[in-house]
């Protein structure tokens, strides 16, 4: 019985680190609830699919400049968020990179929309997979 209690406690503590995995439709609905126009949802869901497989807790491998990419949209810590190791960042989204790794994607969505407004869709290297005809998200609503 003690083992079972310890196991349940360990799993409960580990659960936040596991992150959330969205589906295309659950991400589209969540982003729409956060104010993203329906007309942009096919592009955003495509980017999330190719950047993180819809997972919120992904930290990408180290880039050639020593930076990393965080969260469902793989937002770069050199320009957009402050890494926890104190490394220099322009931190244009004014948040910690850890805030991009939570199940609550509001920070990720706000920051990603800022990136898009400043740099366009091509800020994401995976845009090449998303710039053509995409499946409708109408079946998600």
Curated annotation (Swiss-Prot):
Gene3D superfamilies reported for this sequence: 1.10.530.10
InterPro entries in alphabetical order: Glyco_hydro_22 (IPR001916), Glyco_hydro_22_CS (IPR019799), Glyco_hydro_22_lys (IPR000974), Lysozyme-like_dom_sf (IPR023346)
Reactions mediated catalytically: Hydrolysis of (1->4)-beta-linkages between N-acetylmuramic acid and N-acetyl-D-glucosamine residues in a peptidoglycan and between N-acetyl-D-glucosamine residues in chitodextrins
GO molecular function, one term: lysozyme activity
Catalytic residues identified in the record: 51, 69
Cystines in this chain: 25-140, 46-130, 81-97, 93-111
Signal peptide: 1-19
PROSITE patterns to which the protein is assigned, alphabetical: GLYCOSYL_HYDROL_F22_1 (PS00128), GLYCOSYL_HYDROL_F22_2 (PS51348)
pH dependence: Active at acidic pHs. Inactive above pH 7.
Entry's EC annotation: 3.2.1.17
Sites carrying sugar chains: 65, 104
Domain C-type lysozyme: 20-141
Keyword terms, alphabetized: Disulfide bond, Glycoprotein, Glycosidase, Hydrolase, Signal
Role this protein plays: May not function as a self-defense protein, but as a digestive enzyme, probably in the gut of the insect body. Inactive towards Micrococcus luteus. Active toward glycol chitin.
PANTHER family reported for this sequence: GEO02684P1-RELATED, LYSOZYME C
Family indicated by similarity: Belongs to the glycosyl hydrolase 22 family.
Protein name: Lysozyme 1
Organism: Musca domestica
Lineage per the UniProt record: Eukaryota, Metazoa, Ecdysozoa, Arthropoda, Hexapoda
């Amino acid at each position: 019985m003690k083992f079972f209690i310890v196991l349940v406690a360990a799993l409960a503590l580990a659960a936040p680190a596991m992150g959330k995995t969205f589906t295309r439709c659950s991400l589209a609905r969540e982003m729409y609830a956060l104010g993203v126009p329906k007309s942009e949802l096919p592009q955003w869901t495509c980017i999330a699919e190719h950047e993180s497989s819809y997972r919120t807790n992904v930290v990408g491998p180290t880039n050639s400049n020593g930076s990393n990419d965080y969260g469902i949209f793989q937002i770069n810590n050199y320009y957009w968020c402050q890494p926890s190791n104190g490394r220099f960042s322009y931190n244009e989204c004014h948040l910690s990179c850890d805030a991009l790794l939570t199940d609550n994607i509001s920070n990720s969505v706000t920051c990603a929309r800022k990136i898009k407004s400043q740099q366009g869709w091509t800020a994401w290297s995976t845009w090449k997979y998303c710039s053509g005809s995409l499946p409708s998200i109408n079946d998600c609503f």
